[in-house]
Amino acid sequence: MTQEILSALDGEVFAVWFLIGAALVFWMQAGFAMCESGFTRAKNAGNIIMKNLMDFWIGTVMWFIIGASLMLGDNVMNGFAGGISFDVFTNYKNFDYSAFVFNLVFCATTATIVSGAMAERTKFSSYCVYSAVISAIIYPIEAHWTWGGGFLAQWGFHDYAGSNCIHMVGGICALIGAWMLGPRIGKFERDGSGKVKKVNAFPGHNLVIAALGVFILWLGWYGFNGAAATDVPTLGSVFLTTTVAPAVATVVCLIFTWAKYGKPDVSMCLNASLAGLVAITAPCDVTDCFGAAIIGAVSGLLVVFGIWFNDYKAHVDDPVGAVAVHMLNGIWGTIAVGLFATSTAPGFAVAGIDEGLFYGGGFTQLIKQLGGIGVTALWTVVTITITFFIIKKTIGLRVSEEEEIVGLDSTEHGLPSAYSGFAIMDISNTMDVNENTNLGEADYDKASEAKRNASVHVENMSETLQGTVMQTGINKVVIITKLSMYDKIKKALNDLGVTGITVTQVTGCGIQKGSSQMYRGVEMDMTLLPKIKLEVVVSQIPVDRVIETAKKTLYTGKIGDGKIFVYPVSKVVKIRTGEEDFAALQDVE
């Protein structure tokens, strides 16, 4: 009798833990939001947060309508999918509420992986559509193959918590999406033949927030990997491997980036922690501490290689490293089951699989793992490519050039800034690291208005203050540009007829050119060259001609070529003669 009571209590405890684990996985959405927003620029932070929210909102709706039954329903078509049912509406009394919620939060994780790789240039409406497709069709069907009693489960394929079903699938969607979408403006500089000659770094605006996101994700991962455990030894072992793998991955990445780039790369190490977590997700129940350490070590190197390969070989712009973290390490973690599965792990007996190659089990399990990866990858590539293609040909995937340059917070959501009360939005557009970023068109006459404005920004206070100050028709034009442009702009203004120019050299700050600074393996141009400020007061020459002349002269096709400020002048007095306004300027202009 006592044993029966203890068994019943044990079952109830793990049933509660199962739901606590689901809550921890839900909390991971906050981690993804923090990571992605921290790794991207401030002008898109609100957009990133909104997309991470929509993953769960849209995913929940899609899940109870169709996704849950496709994954959890009885096998149809020889285990290809679950049968469509509406038990959540028609048979609620006998419905498996816990399984519904637990698998829902996993589904949301798959969808949210994609947003980081496609950040800063994707239409919000398009994002909502493909997020819905992933949650309704792509994830539920392939997850059924492994976790819903489908053909992969029957074959002996093993993915305990989602290296394959969640992370590889999300990573493949991210890769194809980023590739079809194209890079952010200025990420890659190309020569006349179209060959990439330089890769530019776009550092995230807040690594502190990104680090917080990593810690939130790591905490959530204990639920992600551990929630399905049904006994204490297995749960303890899962917690151990889930701790060891990311720790080793981060240390290996630290050492490698320190040796390769001269300094340990903060953002790369943050990615390495996540890479180790992704890789250990599939084998966490069937491997031991040694296996977890090796899996983590490979992850720490794989994430660095993946980010480098995307930047320098594939030329796929992935702002947060989602492809390297999730796709590559999802594949590696799934393969690792066939290498490091051992009968000494508490969860091995429950898994019902063969031991790994390195533990005397031969190639049997490894072949099953490779087969599962291949089938799942093929399904994902085909379905997400069709999805993105249809979206691209209908509502479009990418925002306009002007919207991208201004920032999606403003253009997609009407937010002047995600940081109300702080001038981060304005600062982000003129950050040192963004200066000299190529806009893709060096000819002023061929450049779009958005590129012209990004290169030489104009703030016309005469128009803004019209009606609030005395209008004399006199304007002060202030031009801030690089010191090297002085002779060129001086001659252009002189040819225009502007001769009275006040010039001030502005003290630059930052790291001098030639210093080797790296961000995620990409060399940064941290230089803020000495600048000059030119001030002219014009009355007879139309101010628009002065602005246009300055813009055309300063434009080189890169962000930060110059800034122009125009202020209305309410009174001018020549001290020597007492002349005022127009008369005071006759021998100056």
What is each of the regions a protein language model found here?
Residues 2-465:
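Glycine- and aromatic-enriched membrane alpha-helices
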Residues 411-415, 430-589:
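Positively charged, small/polar-rich N-terminal and surface patches that mediate targeting and assembly
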